[in-house]
């Protein structure tokens, strides 16, 4: 489930920087939740265009770092751990299983 949350966060930060919808971004993150997370810019595209052609590497590195610490930012702002986003991620996985929609999720 962490992969779904982290991928959504990564896509959101990229979308904000590029002024596009997160729905137009395809991205892949590997590893655990937090510092061990590995976003893969090589496999990140915006409407099929590699993100590395749309944004400079320094800005991309900053977005990756923000993605890694984004959960902690949320906890500091809310004063508690998130509950809505993990629930929504779990619901997406359950729906995909029940409906046999053959969706691929980045989970660990």
PLM features per residue range, with description:
Residues 1-11:
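Rossmann-like NAD(P)(H) cofactor-binding subdomain of soluble oxidoreductases
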